[in-house]
Amino acid sequence: LFIAHDLAVVRHFSQRVAVMYLGKIIEIGDRASIYTRPRHPYTHALLSAVPEVSVAGESAGPRERIRLAGDVPSPISPPSGCRFRTRCWKAQDRCAAEEPPLIRVSGNREGHLTACHFPEDPTTEARAEDIVLDPALAALEEGGH
């Protein structure tokens, strides 16, 4: 178990990733699926803050940063329904009325679950070459020692 707020670091240490908001898991899946096809708006916002670097080590260009409006609600007294709804640009009445279950959304890979009534469309196709691993971690994943 590796807990961090820095998704740029999490990418290099984890095979499965769970994204939490106010103490609840709102998205969980394998690393490639979360980083290349995030479905929860909060996951999109978090990933928009991760700097992009090209293979040559130069900036890959500007990424549209999602800035969340409003204050973070109290975890002691979270809002009704979806805990992220007070800061979500997709929130509707249903989000306040019922908490979204953590389910597999159409288009997600097996094991990629999202808790959102109005999930984001996948923004990219999952490609293994998009994930650059530390060589030691890559060797472990390939069965090396």
Where does each model-flagged region fall?
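A short, surface-exposed alpha-helical micro-motif characterized by mixed small hydrophobic
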Residues: V10-H12
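Short, glycine/charged-rich "phosphate-handling" switch motifs in NTP-dependent
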Residues: R16, I28
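Charged, flexible cofactor/metal-binding loops and thiol motifs
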Residues: D30-G144
